[in-house]
Amino acid sequence: MVQSSMTESNRTASGTPVPGRAWLMLALATVGFAVNFWAWALLSPLGPRFKDGLDLSSFEQSLLVAVPVVVGSLGRIPVGALTDRFGGRVMFPIVSAATIVPVLYLGLAGHSSLAALLVGGFFLGIGGTAFAVGVPLVNAWFPPERRGLAIGVFGAGMGGTAISALTTVKLVDANSMSTPFLITAGVLAVYAVAAALLLRDAPGRTVPSEPLARRLAATVRLPITRQASALYAVAFGGYVAFSVYLPTYLKTGYGLSQADAANRMAGFVLLAVAMRPFGGWLSDRIGPVRVLAASLTTVVAGAVAQAFTPALAPVGTIAFLAMAAALGAGSGATFALVALRTPADQVGSVTGVVGAAGGLGGFLPPLVMGSLYGAYESYAIGLVLLAIVSAGALAFTLTAVRAPHAGGEGKARTGRRREPRTSGTTA
C-alpha cells in the first residue's frame, strides 16, 4: 500500500497528456478572472483621494474599499453553485457583462458622495465572483495531477488588482475620474463577447441534478469545505486585505505619496500573483499541506517583524515581500487541496464557499486596522493579530488538515491521485 501510494505520488506531470484546448480554456479563464478583478479593485487605489475629497474618517475609508470585497465574497457561493449547474461558458460572460453596470455608474455619476460610492461598490462586488466561475471550469479540463498547477495559473488572474493599482491613479491624474472606469468597462465588454464566442466547458462535465439548496447543504458538510475555508480566509484573505489597505497603510504609517504607495502595493500584488501558480505546482509535487505550513510560518514571521514598524528599507520591504510570496503560495496550495479532495460535481459549490471565506477574510482586517489606527495611531496591534491568526491556521494545518478524514472526503478521492504524503505514516 505504501509503495503503491509513493509511486503514484511521485508520478511526473508529463504522465497524463493534456489536450491543447485545455490550455486555451485556462488562458481564457485567467484573462477573464484578471479583467473582473481589475474592475473589482478600482476603488482601493482611490481610497486616499476619496478620503481627502469627501472628508471621510479612517473607518469610512476602510468601509468604502471593503464593501466590494464582502459582496464579491458572499456572491461566490451562489455563483459557484450556478457554475456547477450551467457551466463556465454561460457564467463567465454573464458575470463580466453584469460588472460593466456598476463600473459605468461609478465612473459617470457614483463618486460624488460616500453613499453613492457605497452603492456602486456594493454592485462592483459582482466582479469578485468570477473566481467561483473559473475554478470549476479549469478543474474539469485537467487531470488530477495537473490541477494544482492549472488552478494556480488561473489564480494568477488575481493580478488584475495590480493593473488597477498601477493605472487607476495615473489615469485619473492624466485625464479625469471617469477615465479608468470607462476603460475597464470597455475591456469587460470585449471579454464578455470573446468568452461567449470562444469559451467551452470540458467534455463530459458532470452536471448536478439536485436542487441548489440541497447541493449547498451537502457542500458545507464536506470536511474539505470547512478546512479549506479556514485556510483560505487567512491566505487569500490576507492578500485581499493588504491589496486594498496597503496604500492607506503606507501613506499613513510611512508618509508616502499616494502614487508611491500604489506602486508599492502593485509590487506586493505582483509577487503574490507570481507565487500562486508556484504554490500550486509545488503542491502537485510535495503536497499542499507542506506548502501551506511553510507559507503560514513565513506570514507569522513577517507580521511579527512588521508589528515593530521598522524602517521601510530594508526590513519593512523584506517583511511585506515575504508575506506577499507566502500568501500567494498559500492561496495556490489551498486550492490544490480543494482540487485533490473535492467530488467533481461539487467543485463549483466548494469553490464558492471557500472563495467566500477568503474574501470575508479580507473584509475584516481593513476595518480593524482603520479602527485601531483611529484609536491608537498605530497599526502594531493589527499586525500582531495577523500573526496570532496565522499561527492558529498553521496549527490547524498540521493537525486536522494533515490527517485524512473519513466519509465524504474518502469519496472525493475515489479514482483520483493520492495527495503526496507529508510523513512516513500510512494514515
What do these predicted ranges mean?
Residues G120-G157:
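Cytoplasmic helix-loop-helix junction between adjacent transmembrane helices
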Residues A115-T129, A233, V315-A329:
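Hydrophobic core of transmembrane alpha-helices in multi-pass small-molecule transporters
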Residues V153-R200:
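Helix-loop-helix hairpin linking two adjacent transmembrane segments in secondary transporters
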Residues I286-T334:
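C-terminal transmembrane helical hairpin of 12-TM major facilitator-type secondary transporters
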Residues L74-H111, S283:
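Conserved MFS/SLC helix-loop-helix module at the cytosolic interface between two early adjacent transmembrane helices
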Residues N10-P19, D201-S229, R416:
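Juxtamembrane intracellular "pre-TM" segments in multi-pass secondary transporters
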Residues L43-G47, I224-P277:
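Extracytoplasmic gate region of multi-pass secondary transporters
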